[in-house]
């Protein structure tokens, strides 16, 4: 193989209109009529194993290009056929370079990127990242927007990893939940537990002692007097009524428990006495609980005394 690069667009396999197609033996290559004069359209082939003589052929100006010396099937040779973009494998072309040493796509891409973008700007950015001025500008920007910025790692090789916390946007709505470091704290409209002073508690207890249920007018008067809202006074009275109900219920349960215990002890004492008397054979007559005297009995008693 002589190493001649054959380009299919210049040398198609099938002939164009008006061309003659000749079958070539194995081991040879086809050349279109582009390499010859248009008056004599004829395809020829050259063998890859023969030595290259010299032959000059006329052709169209657009098709005259150098392919190197080649021997044609039919007895002629072609030399000084120059190409601008295609050359020998061993030679270096201006358009595509050496074919024996393929160009890496990565290097080609890097070269194009270097030509497209200014490398000095990247260098200045790297210098800024190294000296910390970039961090200062980011912090200043974060302070203006209300974001919290924390450096996760030191800038290295033009890469700076920053962890941005959720910003509190100025266009937010009050009903939107607040996310970020304040989660779990009292944020927004969450109410705290109301604490009452000793004076307020004393006045409320005095009012509850006389009136367990308040009217609207009295509630308004207490709110102005104690500096509380009507809702706070209403809730306090509700809680106080529940507390009073619970205390009274516990007191009733305690009294009923004590009475049951006394009755049980009395009954057990009488039963023990009766069992002891029955064992000894003694019969005790119970004394009547009350003596009822009629009128006749009183008259009889008086006569007995006077006599």
From Swiss-Prot:
The record's family statement is: Belongs to the Antp homeobox family.
The protein's matches in Pfam families, at most eight in alphabetical order, are given as: Homeodomain
Q: Which CDD domains match?
A: homeodomain (cd00086)
Q: Name one GO biological process term.
A: anterior/posterior pattern specification
- Where is this protein found? Nucleus
For this protein, the DNA-binding region equals 189-248
Q: What is this protein called?
A: Homeobox protein HB1
Checking Gene3D superfamilies in the record gives:
Homeodomain-like (1.10.10.60)
Q: Where is this motif: Antp-type hexapeptide?
A: 172-177
GO: which molecular function terms? Answer: DNA-binding transcription factor activity, RNA polymerase II-specific; RNA polymerase II cis-regulatory region sequence-specific DNA binding
> What is the organism field in this record?
Tripneustes gratilla (Hawaian sea urchin)
Q: Where is this region: Disordered?
A: 42-62, 246-277
GO cellular component, alphabetical, reads: nucleus
Keywords for this protein: Developmental protein, DNA-binding, Homeobox, Nucleus
Q: Superkingdom of the source?
A: Eukaryota
PANTHER family on file? HOMEOBOX PROTEIN ABDOMINAL-A, HOMEOBOX PROTEIN HOX
- Its main localization is nucleus
């Amino acid at each position: 193989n002589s190493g001649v690069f054959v380009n299919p667009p210049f040398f198609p396999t099938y002939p164009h209109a008006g061309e003659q197609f000749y079958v070539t033996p194995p081991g040879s290559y086809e050349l279109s009529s582009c390499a010859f004069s248009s008056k004599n359209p004829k395809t020829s082939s050259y063998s890859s194993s023969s030595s290259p003589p010299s032959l000059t052929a006329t052709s169209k100006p657009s098709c005259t290009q150098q392919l190197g010396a080649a021997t044609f099937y039919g007895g002629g040779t072609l030399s000084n056929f120059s190409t601008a973009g295609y050359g020998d494998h061993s030679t270096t072309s201006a358009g595509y370079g050496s074919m024996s040493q393929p160009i890496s796509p990565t290097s080609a891409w890097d070269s194009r990127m270097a030509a497209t973008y200014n490398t000095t700007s990247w260098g200045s950015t790297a210098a800024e990242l190294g000296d910390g001025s970039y961090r200062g500008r980011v912090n200043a920007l974060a302070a203006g927007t209300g974001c919290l910025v924390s450096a996760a790692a030191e800038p290295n090789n033009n890469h700076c990893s920053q962890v941005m916390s959720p910003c509190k946007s100025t266009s937010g709505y009050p009903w939107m939940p607040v996310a970020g470091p304040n989660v779990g704290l009292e944020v927004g409209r969450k109410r705290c537990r109301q604490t009452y002073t000793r004076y307020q508690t004393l006045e409320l207890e005095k009012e509850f002692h006389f009136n367990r249920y308040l009217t609207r007018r009295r509630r308004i008067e207490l709110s102005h007097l104690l500096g509380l809202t009507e809702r706070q006074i209403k809730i306090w009275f509700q809680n106080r009524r529940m507390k009073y109900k619970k205390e009274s219920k516990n007191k009733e349960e305690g009294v009923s428990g004590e009475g049951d215990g006394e009755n049980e002890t009395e009954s057990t004492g009488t039963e023990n006495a009766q069992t002891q008397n029955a064992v000894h054979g003694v019969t005790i007559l119970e004394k009547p609980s009350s003596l009822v005297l009629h009128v006749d009995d009183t008259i009889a008693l008086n006569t007995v005394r006077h006599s």
